[in-house]
A protein has these predicted regions:
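C-terminal motif of bacterial Sec signal peptides marking the signal peptidase cleavage site
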Residues: 15-18
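Short linear sequence elements within intrinsically disordered, low-complexity coil regions
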Residues: 10-13, 335
């Protein structure tokens, strides 16, 4: 959630006509990388509009993969790996987005729907991967709250349907099992857990059955996807993480290893942790290069597989909350360049 003048609030000193600027909080030093690709600005200008990306990988032709990004005021965009817009689906009020392959060679896209601020809803669409177009596929009402975070996972072996986790504004974490019958999607929801304050970032690791949730002003929670047992694994410390904690993403390696990445929005950085122990590895920023730098990031996405010659060892996408003088957009970064900058073991 972008906060105006984050880190630059003016504080009255109680002296007539006098005030002082509070310096922004800056975390530990961060290495820098640059974006290889950017999308066009979203259609909503001069507002906090672009929010969250998702990646669909074309296994047969990785360079022909697609990404989906939200404009909270307008709807869903589909882009290719050159950043070109493939399509747009009007659907105002959407926030976070995720996608997953489902039977029949189809791709289900789900976004948290904030058009009703009293009820968490899941907006569903099917992605035609040949044309890059989205077709609406209904809504599922989840429960009370204002929808923010959303992430999906396929159930463990033998399970049916798709599991969607919702992280609304109030801190309740919902678990919805989505099934399809006769072309209609329905959901059965239970409450998985509760954290004290506002959440948003959401990523599920099916290897360990762990759901990672970002509590914006507290840190990152690891939650058992079945029992709801939780523990705070990375607290905001103004070193590795500076509030708000926003988007979360993982790059899995092996049985339970890899990396967890979090948007440290308060100082325009990204914190990287080693899995499975969520041990801090380092921080990076996206600096000015062929494209502009990236600030005030909400959503991120990461896939460490091959995406063709432009992104041969993985793709990291960040929402750019500034992108001046244009409207907000999304920027693509080579994941191997992030790891090289961090001098991460490979």
């Amino acid at each position: 959630m972008l906060r105006a003048f984050h880190g630059f609030a003016l504080v009255s000193l109680g002296i007539a006509g006098g005030c002082a600027t509070v310096p922004p909080i800056m975390g530990d030093p961060a290495v820098t990388v640059t974006a290889r690709v950017e999308t066009p600005p979203v259609g909503t200008a001069r507002e906090d509009a672009a929010d969250d990306p998702a990646i669909w990988r074309n296994a047969a032709n990785p360079a022909a993969s697609l990404t989906v990004g939200t404009d909270k005021k307008a709807g869903l965009y589909v882009y290719d790996l050159k950043g070109a817009q493939k399509s747009f689906l009007a659907a105002p009020g959407l926030n976070n987005v995720d996608l997953i392959d489902i039977p029949g060679g189809r791709v289900l896209v789900i976004a948290s729907d904030r058009s009703d601020l009293a009820t968490v809803n899941l907006f569903m669409a099917l992605l035609d991967t040949a044309t890059g177009k989205l077709a609406p596929a209904g809504k599922i009402a989840v429960g009370p709250g204002e929808g923010y975070g959303i992430c999906m996972v396929k159930p463990a072996r033998g399970g049916e349907g798709i599991i969607a986790f919702s992280a609304p504004k109030g801190g309740t974490i919902y678990r919805t099992v989505i099934r399809e019958a006769g072309g209609v999607f329905t959901g059965t929801t239970t409450t998985l857990a509760q954290v004290p304050t506002q959440t948003e970032g959401c990523i599920a690791d099916p290897r360990t059955g762990t759901l990672f949730i970002g509590e914006e002003d507290a840190g990152i929670w690891a939650i058992d996807m079945t029992t709801g047992a939780k523990r705070l694994v990375a607290a905001i410390d103004n070193k590795v993480l500076v509030a708000d904690v926003e988007g979360l993403a993982i790059a899995p390696e092996g049985k339970d290893g890899g990396y967890l990445v979090a948007s440290s929005q308060g100082d325009n950085a990204y914190a990287v942790f080693r899995l499975p122990d969520v041990t801090p590895l380092g921080r990076f920023r996206i600096a000015q290069g062929a494209f502009g730098s990236v600030e005030e990031t909400d959503g991120i996405e990461l896939d460490n597989r091959d995406f063709g010659p432009d992104f041969p060892n993985g793709l990291f996408i960040a929402q750019d909350g500034v992108n001046a003088p244009s409207a907000q957009n999304f920027k693509y970064v080579r994941w191997d360049e992030v790891l090289a900058a961090l001098e991460a073991p490979r």
